[in-house]
Design a protein with these regions (language model features):
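Helix-biased detector of long, well-ordered alpha-helical tracts
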Residues: 1-155
């Protein structure tokens, strides 16, 4: 759901103590300082999703939890990920309080209804296959991601 990268930009703006923010910068700062969680959307989504996780520790780190628990490999198309700023930072940084979920194709119509009802932006960024881990593709080529996201034990 939503855009990735806004919170990391918001944190950088806060660190820089930047004044006279543009409207897009104000949104990023708000995403970092006062993230919004749509509980009603989450409740409706829980009725049709196969799995779901908030990606507050970063898309890569949290999607990996889904992969480990389902014994499947995720393939992300980076070109489809709605993001702001540096693409690698956007998918590895935390604090974007968005959801990553999996859903069967038979539930897509219901998903569209739910997203419209709650005015939540949803995007198909990839798929699950047999295997382990996560591969990230950009323009059809696999790219290497060194940092996976926030780790509560290592920081």
């Amino acid at each position: 759901t939503g855009n990735l990268g806004e919170a990391s930009i918001g944190l950088n703006l806060l660190k820089q103590k930047k004044q006279n923010l543009k409207s897009a910068e104000k949104i990023c700062l708000k995403r970092f300082l006062k993230p919004e969680i749509n509980f009603l959307f989450s409740q409706d989504l829980s009725k049709i999703a196969n799995s779901c996780i908030d990606i507050s520790d970063g898309l890569m780190a949290d999607l990996n939890h889904i992969c480990e628990q389902s014994n499947l490999k995720a393939e992300i198309n980076l070109d489809n990920v709605p993001l702001i700023g540096n693409p690698i930072t956007a998918i590895t940084w935390g604090d974007d309080y968005q959801l990553c979920f999996t859903i069967g194709s038979s539930k897509l119509k219901k998903l569209v209804e739910i997203s419209k009802k709650h005015k939540i932006k949803i995007t198909n960024i990839g798929k699950l296959n047999k295997g382990k881990g996560i591969s990230v593709l950009s323009k059809g080529k696999k790219i290497n991601i060194k940092k996976a996201g926030y780790n509560h034990f290592n920081g």
